[in-house]
């Protein structure tokens, strides 16, 4: 991966020890992590997204595995995005739901939904025991970029409807970044994960941000391959962003 860090030539990157891969159970992984003690992280965070990094709490990282380059950074060119038939059906199916943007501040309702989601959708994934502290550490960034996009049932007699999904989103200059989305596991038929991305795309369009960063696409992975459906998609090849291709080889040049 190439990093044009000027005027940040003294940025420090650390490579983590090997750890079990979170996507392929038979593989080991490692990451590049920017120095978490660097006081400039908040200021350069928007640029690191363009370098293929992601945020987890106050950590900025990207996969850097010796024998695998399956994790490919992707972003949606929102001005060129055209929903496909399935996505249009998803929007129509959920047309009565209410979306609002709120500050990235945890409340009991969000925490309850988060814990139900992890318990039912990701049991034994290492996160199903998360509580309030882990919620804050994982989802709420320290630099003020974060917002929560809530998706709810319609209000009844002035009372807010049931909270169905929360899309943790960073709002930066030139882009939005989809950090993490959790939703009501018993409403999976609604396609709430897809709906959240569609609303994030519309949000970026309204804010005149040309890109929505979706993290990493992994070809043929049952949880990560869905990102290819949001076209026009772009991939980061280690040097620059280019149009999405399922056959384009990636590199680990640094």
Swiss-Prot record:
Its EC number is 2.3.2.29. It comes from the Bacteria. Its main location: cytoplasm. It is found in: Cytoplasm. GO terms for biological process: ubiquitin-dependent protein catabolic process via the N-end rule pathway. SUPFAM superfamilies: Acyl-CoA N-acyltransferases (Nat). One of its GO terms (molecular function) is leucyl-tRNA--protein transferase activity. Pfam families: ATE_C, ATE_N. GO terms for cellular component: cytoplasm. Keywords: Acyltransferase, Cytoplasm, Transferase. It catalyses: N-terminal L-glutamyl-[protein] + L-leucyl-tRNA(Leu) = N-terminal L-leucyl-L-glutamyl-[protein] + tRNA(Leu) + H(+); N-terminal L-aspartyl-[protein] + L-leucyl-tRNA(Leu) = N-terminal L-leucyl-L-aspartyl-[protein] + tRNA(Leu) + H(+). Functions in the N-end rule pathway of protein degradation where it conjugates Leu from its aminoacyl-tRNA to the N-termini of proteins containing an N-terminal aspartate or glutamate. NCBIfam families: PRK01305.1-1, PRK01305.1-3, PRK01305.2-3. Belongs to the R-transferase family. Bpt subfamily. HAMAP family: Bpt. This is Aspartate/glutamate leucyltransferase.
